[in-house]
């Protein structure tokens, strides 16, 4: 605390005050010196910067960015693993090279035991099957590529020997759906062949030439594009017959079930 005192004024002022004091009388006493007490001002301190709050916000931002980068890395790694490992494994699981032993009661009265091999590719998501039948070792049919398109409800046969395509409505009583066919082949994947089975025969006849192949769907279009393509009409499905009822027919033997099917395409142009 600072004490400030005011002393009496200069001589002129003192004389005036003396005259006034004499006029007022002796009763009046001399006034004491005026004093003012001043409290010293507080020391001004520079404002504190709230560095902690700003620093914490920046730290959260950096942490968030780091988490985003980490998550993006995990996503890209997952996509890579899915594409190059899972899909490759799935493709291997959907591809089958298999065969079946069956008794041939169609070619002769004496039942002979034959072997049929084929490569099967099943597309579960697209809901179609693709079958490749190589040249049979002991005759009994032509090599062929077959597509069963369950979305379109169509079957296409590409007779490799004739280099022609034939299209007909899908026969779901003979052809197993992709999921069921896949389960069947997975169950017998440990072995090389399916259990010994029998053969049935279906007969078809050529009806008309197909010009607009794009209307058949993309799968059949890619199979038959650039080839003469014809529509078929089904005549009959028979089992264990000893004599073929039609001449001028081409046979394709294949299986999409627990039995073998011989498809006769008659009236070939």
From Swiss-Prot:
Task: According to the UniProt record, list the residues that bear Phosphothreonine.
Answer: 39
Annotated membrane topology? Single-pass type II membrane protein
An example Pfam family from this entry, by short name, is BRICHOS
Q: Where is it localised?
A: Lysosome membrane; Cell membrane
- Which biological process terms from the Gene Ontology are attached to this UniProt entry? negative regulation of amyloid precursor protein biosynthetic process; negative regulation of neuron projection development; neuron differentiation; positive regulation of extrinsic apoptotic signaling pathway
Which UniProt key words apply to this protein?
Cell membrane, Cleavage on pair of basic residues, Disulfide bond, Glycoprotein, Lysosome, Membrane, Phosphoprotein, Signal-anchor, Transmembrane, Transmembrane helix
Q: State one molecular function term (GO).
A: ATP binding
Q: Could you confirm whether the keyword Disulfide bond appears in this record?
A: yes
**Mostly located where?**
membrane
Q: Where is this site: Cleavage?
A: 243-244
Describe PTMs of this protein. Answer: Type I membrane-bound, as well as soluble, furin has a pre-eminent role in ITM2C proteolytic processing. PCSK7 and PCSK5 may also be involved although to a lesser extent. The soluble form of PCSK7 is incapable of processing ITM2C. Fails to undergo shedding by ADAM10 and intramembrane cleavage by SPPL2B.
The organism's place on the tree of life at top rank: Eukaryota
Q: Where is the BRICHOS domain?
A: 138-232
Q: Which residues cross the membrane?
A: 57-77
Q: What does this protein do?
A: Negative regulator of amyloid-beta peptide production. May inhibit the processing of APP by blocking its access to alpha- and beta-secretase. Binding to the beta-secretase-cleaved APP C-terminal fragment is negligible, suggesting that ITM2C is a poor gamma-secretase cleavage inhibitor. May play a role in TNF-induced cell death and neuronal differentiation.
- What is the annotated quaternary arrangement, including any partners? Interacts with BACE1. Interacts with APP. Interacts with STMN2.
What protein family is recorded? Belongs to the ITM2 family.
Family matches, as PANTHER family? INTEGRAL MEMBRANE PROTEIN 2C, INTEGRAL TRANSMEMBRANE PROTEIN 2
Entry protein name:
Integral membrane protein 2C
Task: State the organism of origin.
Answer: Rattus norvegicus (Rat)
Name of the coding gene: Itm2c
